[in-house]
Each structure stands twice: as C-alpha cells, then as structure tokens.
C-alpha cells in the first residue's frame, strides 16, 4: 500500500544526515553537504508524505494507495519521532493532534494503523511506548486534556491488567499475546 516507501525510513535518513553533519563539524571536516541533504529530506517528507486532505502524514508518499486511502503511519517508532525530530510544521502538528484527538484515539489508547479494521499484531493494537511522541506534542501544544487522557489510559491499562504490557487491544484494553513486560512502564 505504501508503494515500497516508508515514512519512518525517510525520517531516519534525514536524521542520519543531520548526525553526519554534527559529527563532521565536531571533527573539523567539511559538513555542509550533509546539512543540505537533511534539509532536502525534510522538505521532501513534508511535501510528499503530508496529505492535506486528511491532515496527516501517510505511510506512503503522494501517488501510493496509502496516500489515496489516507492511511496514517503510526506503525511504530514514527509515532515517537515525528514531533521530536521536527518533521511536522506547527500547523501540521496541530492538525495531527486534532485528528488524533477527534478521529483516531480509542478509550484504551492510540491504535496503530488507524483505518485498518483487521486485527493483527500491528493493526488495531495499542503499543504504549509509541504514545510518548504524541504525549510530548500534546504537552508542547498546551493540549492538557489530551495529555492527561494519554497518561490516564496507560495507568488504567496497567491497573486493569495488573501490570504493564507492551501491547493492548485498541477495542477493549486487554493485554495482547505477550506476557507482562514491566519495561513498558517507561513509555
């Protein structure tokens, strides 16, 4: 559905170029080319993966099924990094968070791959650690009610299931498949 592309991979390449720039600069080497490449990647991500009709970044760029069907890429780490690494402009960030709050979030958390109705280890599951990027964005934007909701969901899921789990069912909050993993409390 993403036409062989992945938003998260593009984001990682952008950040790798930023890191290369910083490392080479520290070493006194020529580094500007990598800063230029990072800026080009950011511009491409914002132009090709941003779906203005949907108000989200999609898992595939313009021209793919994912873009046409408005498939939101929240299939993992990109849910954490899009805000932290400055992928979204302020306007995009506000639209993403509004869509999250009014169209995507369930009473038990943020389901991965919204729009996919099938239940797999990804679709319709809540991976708590990936909530952190959205929680940071909610805090930065002053969306206190959403921030409290995101935190309270994780607390309730832990209390309901009597410990922390990595994955929850987006429809009923029950722990999904794997045994308890207390390290997920860090999410």
Question: What do the PLM-derived regions correspond to, one by one?
Answer:
Residues 44-49, 53:
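Short amphipathic coiled-coil heptad-repeat segments
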Residues 1-39, 56-187:
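Active-site core of glycosidic bond-cleaving carbohydrate-active enzymes
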